[in-house]
Amino acid sequence: MARCRHHSGYVADDEASHSMCSARVQLPKKPLVPEMGPASKLGHVPHPPSTCGSSALQNQRRNKRHPQPFSHFLDFLTESHVLDSLETVVEKATERMAAMKTEAGVPLVEVQDPVEVPSGGRRAHARPSLSTVHRHRVRPTLCTGHPNNYPSSSSSMSDSHSSLMAGWLGSHSRDSDLGAQGLGSLPPVKDRLLLEKNLKRLLQLERKGKGLSQSCSKRDSLLWDLLGSQTSFQWTQEQPLSWFSELLGSSSGVPEASEPRPGEQEPICKREFNKEIKSLLSQLESLDLPGYCPLREPHRTLNFLADHRLFPALQSVVNQAVDKLRGARCRDGRPLFPTSLEPPSELQVQRNLPPLGSEPAKPTNSGQPHPTVSSPKTPQRKHKDRGGSPSMSSAQVATRFKLKVTPMEKPDIPSPSLHSREKEPDSDPKLQNPPVSLSSRQRAQPWRGLHLTLPAPGIVVEVACGQGHLRVVTPPLACPYPHSSCYLLPELSPVTSSSPSSLCPEVTSSKVGPDMSLQEKGSLTHHS
């Protein structure tokens, strides 16, 4: 025989080493796998593995040639019963493919049964025979083998072979021809049933949420005691952590002042730890936590925090952390996060100003010119003067304003209203604009070129030149804008100048309503 078929029909790659093994293999009387085409290999019965895997023959094989990795891989597949499970999957797939039919009722694939078809002829049927189906049904689904599902390379090859051969020789085979020879490829029936029973038990425990059975807990407790007795002198020399004793919540926790013996404290910690684990595992049944969904998880978390009123607790924790950070100091005594270095904001400066309105000031750059659009209706508008201080009503949108003036010398103006209003913003050097290069004419008359900004909804008043003081002008009652505010317009002093611009100063005002934008440019008459 040129080649030796072994390991479930696979052809080995080492002919010389396996040819001597073929003489010792006792072949059955009836040929299990007839010589047929490749279609017959779908559901064929595997041969029993050869007995040439003993340690002596393996040593001879290693001495003659280097070990063949493929042959060792086949040995591993056979010894750990991986081939049986693979064949089961293939046979199930074959049955499903054989049961499929086309729309015309013709079987989709013609499958030949290798057991019932003789060697000379070929007979195709759409479904396997009853014996084949019965053989497939009794095939177990649990595969046993070495730990980690891989054969150890140290010293258990001969032991594994002897145990496997003992199981094969002592087991009852599923087929009549294999039963006559007393050979098989499965472990004993008792062991198989025991393994399946243990597997079902483990699955039930997983469904119920209990990770420890009675036998496992006893075994783990014994293992815990054994490890604790061996390593108690190593990790109990130091005192237990305070948070660990609080986590256990045991009243039997020994305080740090008293130094107990390592042997006394160890069983207490172990018992409390086991109690905590058991209580947590028993609570898993009543929790009934929903599955994690990344789309709904933020909403669920927020709802959970709101339902259990955890937001105040979290806020208190954050406040405590902020207070601690504020009170933290460096080694030299300075605060870690100083708050006095921050510059005073405009809102703090504006608190010293008289409350003229509700909205904060919005100063504009005096260097940028404002676009003006001439309107013929403005000269015809008549303004009525109001004596005394302005009394703003709640309906009017009164605004707070700032005067930004860059004089070269302190002027003498008899009007107290303008002097009092410009004195407070100028007291702060930060609010003053940087000095601008002035012409000789502006140096002679420093109060010309006054730029006044009213940060109401879009009101800008500019006085090009001229000496005077401010006066409050209210718009007429028939104004088309219901939310109009008071206009602060300059009133010229009796002191006149020879320039034509002083006789007719330009005043630019703009009013922006909710849906409209109007900018007006007009002229004021000179009061002599």
Swiss-Prot record:
- InterPro entries annotated for this entry? DUF4702 (IPR031532)
Name the gene that codes for it.
Answer: CCDC116
Going by the UniProt record, its keywords in alphabetical order are: Coiled coil, Cytoplasm, Cytoskeleton, Phosphoprotein
Q: Which Pfam families match?
A: DUF4702
Q: List where Basic and acidic residues composition bias occurs.
A: 419-429
Which residues are reported to carry the modification Phosphoserine?
S389
Q: Where is the composition biased (Low complexity)?
A: 497-510
Look up keyword Transit peptide and say if it applies. no
Q: Which GO terms describe its cellular component?
A: centrosome; cytoplasm
The name under which this protein is listed is Coiled-coil domain-containing protein 116
Q: Where is the composition biased (Polar residues)?
A: 51-60, 363-378, 434-443
- According to the lineage, what is the superkingdom? Eukaryota
Q: What is the lineage of its organism?
A: Eukaryota, Metazoa, Chordata, Craniata, Vertebrata
Q: What is its main location?
A: cytoplasm
Q: Which residues form a coiled coil?
A: 81-104
Q: Where in the cell is it found?
A: Cytoplasm, Cytoskeleton, Microtubule organizing center, Centrosome
Region annotated Disordered, chain positions: 43-68, 335-444, 497-528
